[in-house]
């Protein structure tokens, strides 16, 4: 597997986490996101999403195998996807959009974004596993 493809994916995942949180939370001032899911999307939770973004960037700088690191990343993304699906089943996106468009957009896309990067991390994991 081309290391450049892996690096681009890791950098993109980091950008989505860091820039996405800063943009949609309006630099941690959008309380509608916090109140829509106070456990997962508190300002602390949003900060931890950004920390995961930094971890993805750090992984892009590693020149050896990152097989088990991306496995952990895939599990992390899986957890967020499950939480997102549960949130969608128990809440109304339409109501959230009426409160704040950025919060509505955030909750509309974050799980899909995490699902896509989960698949990417799994792809890297299995490719590095088969390359041994």
Q: Each PLM stretch: what is its role?
A:
Residues 108-132:
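Membrane-water interface at the C-terminal end of transmembrane alpha helices
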Residues 1-16:
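Cytosolic juxtamembrane helix and N-cap/initiation of the first transmembrane helix
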Residues 15-19, 37-61, 75-82, 112:
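Core segments of alpha-helical transmembrane spans in multipass integral membrane proteins
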Residues 64-93:
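Mid-chain, well-packed structural core segment of small domains
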Residues 27-35, 93-100:
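Membrane-interface helix termini and inter-helical loops of multi-pass transporters
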Residues 39-42, 101-109:
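Short aromatic-rich membrane-water interface segments that cap or initiate transmembrane helices
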Residues 86-106:
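Membrane-helix boundary connector in multi-pass membrane proteins
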Residues 17-28:
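Alpha-helical transmembrane segments of multi-pass membrane proteins
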């Amino acid at each position: 597997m081309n290391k450049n493809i892996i690096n681009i994916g890791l950098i993109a995942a980091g950008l989505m986490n860091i820039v996405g949180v800063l943009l949609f939370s309006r630099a941690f001032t959008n309380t509608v996101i916090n109140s829509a899911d106070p456990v997962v999307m508190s300002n602390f939770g949003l900060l931890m999403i950004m920390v995961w973004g930094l971890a993805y960037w750090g992984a892009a700088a590693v020149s050896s195998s990152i097989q088990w690191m991306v496995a952990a990343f895939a599990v992390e993304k899986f957890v967020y996807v499950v939480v997102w699906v549960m949130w969608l089943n128990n809440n109304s996106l339409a109501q959230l959009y009426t409160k704040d468009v950025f919060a509505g957009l955030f909750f509309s896309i974050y799980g899909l974004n995490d699902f896509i990067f989960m698949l990417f991390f799994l792809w890297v994991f299995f490719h590095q596993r088969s390359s041994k």
